[in-house]
Amino acid sequence: MAETPELEPHNAFDTILTLDFGSQYTHLITRRLRELNVYSEMLPCTQKLADLKFKPAGVILSGGPYSVYEEGAPHVDPAYFDLGVPILGICYGLQEIAYRLDSTNVIAGTSREYGLAQLKAKKVGGHVDHLFDGLEDEFNVWMSHGDKLGKLPEGFHTIATTPNSEYAGIAHETKPIYGLQLHPEVTHTQNGTKLLKNFAVNICGCKQNWTMARFVDQEIARIRKLVGPTGQVLGAVSGGVDSTVAAKLMKEAIGDRFHAVLVDTGFMRLNECEQVKQTLAEHLGINLIVADASQVFMEGLKGISDPEQKRKFIGNKFIDVFEEEAKKIEDAAAHSETAGKIGFFLQGTLYPDVIESISFKGPSATIKTHHNVGGLPKRMTEGQGLKLIEPLRELFKDEVRDLGRQLGIAHEMVMRHPFPGPGIAIRILGEITPERVEMARKADHIFISMIREAGLYDKIGQAFAALDPSRAVGVMGDKRVYENIVLLRAVETTDFMTAIAYPFEHEFLTRVSTRIVNEVSGVCRVAYDYTSKPPGTIELE
């Protein structure tokens, strides 16, 4: 994407850079800022300023699970403090600001402070008060820390206190450097969004112009410049909202020079191929090619149970198929008006995919290789062969849905649940066989159909049925059986970074379970996954 950096979001919009020290809340900082129509990006705390390709309007140092004084604790590049832009430290970030001035400034608290606390703001005068402009003098905030400031850093004022934190808020006397022990990004903090707005808009001077209407124009211009007047793009589509929106955006940018490819891996949902054809080709006017590679994928995954090995194989084989299709398209169009080399490969990668795949030393190590990020072969990520183009890479899921509406995609399509590129293959825990694929496919169809019939589909962020690797004893037809277990998963979420299990009524789950056991051969037991994210991920592999 570096070919046209001047059109990337952080160069087209005022940007707040959030440096992540491993807090479970860090992504919420970016979310809250974007809800304020201020563009924000999150990078690991190891990001060196010299390697940053843009100048942010402000920098936020996130919370984290470390103690700043421990050996091996992460520390920010000191060069950020010489950048000349406002800085806000949150929790660990506050302690990092204080620690770099004097290592004795941060101490272990005599009592930990988790949950709600009453914060009292202190007026000092001048720019120091800007963080709390327009807010009440006292309000409840969310705390999550064991360490605290033992003394006020030299050159700083105290701007807020709580019963357990004498220095719950600090501000530099002359520089726009602020620190908060509380978490303004968490919804439990009253005025949290206002605090972030005061920092981003009033202190950093960011314009509140980050909208999908603006993004569409910027991204179409970027795509056109990147691809050029004759270049062609091949795109992976799966039937999910991400790939559909990405495909429509590419169609708007370069017209018939975009070719969508649906790889039938044999792991699609019931009737998925026909539905994708109808959506993309008939409703959205997109060139669609269906490549049947089901036998190749099934044979290649035989005997593989490890989820990372599955993802790596699927990622590599996907690109093999796409490169074959690219050659066919180029040959067919060699002497036509659309002649041109296919040099790019479109993916519907989202920002949560990127965040989950970022690794740095510490607790925010890679959760899993994402099939849209780490599952690709090196020849793709290192610029060999087809080059990656990911227009949704900086967006959260709700922003993608908004973008889809901006592009004129119908409500039903925009609200479709995500469907991973590897399909049912990563919803079958353990080894994949044709029989197990069919079980998972039928169970999923029953589950989703009943969710739709109950009028719950749009209330749920994502839902699916998966197959457990173990089996269980049951009694069917007066006989003992030892058969498979289906796992049902449905979550409520807005950004797919955090999620909670959807609270179905007991009667509904009973009816779903009864249908699956009666209608799906080889299944004798059904379980519902109540795990939230974190600690779980939404997909099981």
UniProtKB/Swiss-Prot annotation:
Protein name as it appears in the record: GMP synthase [glutamine-hydrolyzing]
Active site: 91 (nucleophile), 183, 185
Subunit comment: Homodimer.
Reported function: Catalyzes the conversion of xanthine monophosphate (XMP) to GMP in the presence of glutamine and ATP through an adenyl-XMP intermediate.
A single GO BP: GMP biosynthetic process
Matches recorded under PANTHER family: GMP SYNTHASE [GLUTAMINE-HYDROLYZING] (PTHR11922:SF2), GMP SYNTHASE-RELATED (PTHR11922)
InterPro entries: Class_I_gatase-like, GATASE, GMP_synth_C, GMP_synth_GATase, GMP_synthase, GMPS_ATP_PPase_dom, NAD/GMP_synthase, Rossmann-like_a/b/a_fold
GO annotation, cellular component aspect: cytosol
Catalytic activity entry: XMP + L-glutamine + ATP + H2O = GMP + L-glutamate + AMP + diphosphate + 2 H(+)
Subcellular location, record wording: Cytoplasm, Cytosol
Residue intervals of the Glutamine amidotransferase type-1 domain: 15-209
Gene: gua1
The protein's annotated pathway: Purine metabolism; GMP biosynthesis; GMP from XMP (L-Gln route): step 1/1
Protein EC: 6.3.5.2
Entry binding sites for XMP: 311, 478, 533, 539
Cofactor (UniProt): Mg(2+)
EC category: ligase
Keyword ATP-binding: yes
GO molecular-function terms, A-Z: ATP binding; GMP synthase (glutamine-hydrolyzing) activity; GMP synthase activity
Pfam families: GATase, GMP_synt_C, NAD_synthase
Keywords recorded for this protein, A-Z: ATP-binding, Cytoplasm, Glutamine amidotransferase, GMP biosynthesis, Ligase, Magnesium, Nucleotide-binding, Purine biosynthesis
Major place of residence: cytoplasm
Position of the signal peptide: none
